[in-house]
């Protein structure tokens, strides 16, 4: 992902305000609710029958944190996202059989959650920067698909 110096500063500053414990669960929970067909990949998570169940689900929160921790790692390697996410791409492709379109959906949900939590600090320019990054991460995660 190519970012300008200003975009990198903005990205770093805003991401420093993110709490992966909180936002990860919210982003994954919203994905599962807005795009309910994604729930089939999370059969082991227990009750996902309602918004209250999904958003309060400890496994959703824990996996959401894990997702954002991986995303944070990717932010440290913007020049090598495919390498950074190679093993996760392989896992999601070969073992989990996740439709790579879901990575784009989750990226867009994450941008929405960031906008909600960061408020006025999440300017249109910041949104543009994050959209570039989530698109790059989604592309990297889809890299191992045939």
Curated annotation (Swiss-Prot):
Keywords associated with the record: Acetylation, Heme, Iron, Metal-binding, Oxygen transport, Phosphoprotein, S-nitrosylation, Transport
Known tissue expression: Red blood cells.
Modified residues (Phosphoserine): 44
Modified residues (S-nitrosocysteine): 93
Residues the entry annotates as binding heme b: 63, 92
Disulfide bridge positions per record: none
One annotated GO biological process: hydrogen peroxide catabolic process
Modified residues (N-acetylvaline): 1
GO cellular component: blood microparticle; haptoglobin-hemoglobin complex; hemoglobin complex
Domain of life: Eukaryota
The keyword Transcription appears for this protein: no
Modified residues (N6-acetyllysine): 59, 82, 144
Domain Globin: 2-146
UniProt GO molecular function: haptoglobin binding; heme binding; hemoglobin alpha binding; metal ion binding; organic acid binding; oxygen binding; oxygen carrier activity; peroxidase activity
Subunit structure: Heterotetramer of two alpha chains and two beta chains.
Purpose of the protein: Involved in oxygen transport from the lung to the various peripheral tissues.
Recorded family membership: Belongs to the globin family.
Protein name, UniProt field: Hemoglobin subunit beta
């Amino acid at each position: 992902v190519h970012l300008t110096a200003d975009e990198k500063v903005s990205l770093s500053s805003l991401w420093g305000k993110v709490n992966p414990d909180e936002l990860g669960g919210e982003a994954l929970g919203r994905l599962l609710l807005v795009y309910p067909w994604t729930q089939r990949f999370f059969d082991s998570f227990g009750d996902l029958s309602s918004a209250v169940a999904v958003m309060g689900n400890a496994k959703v929160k824990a996996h959401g944190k894990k997702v954002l921790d991986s995303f944070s790692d990717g932010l440290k390697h913007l020049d090598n996202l495919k390498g950074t996410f190679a093993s996760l791409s392989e896992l999601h492709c070969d073992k989990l059989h996740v439709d790579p379109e879901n990575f784009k959906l989750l990226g867009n949900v994450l941008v929405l959650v960031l906008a909600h939590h960061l408020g006025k600090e999440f300017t249109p320019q910041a949104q543009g920067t994050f959209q570039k990054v989530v698109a790059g991460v989604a592309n990297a995660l889809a890299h191992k698909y045939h």
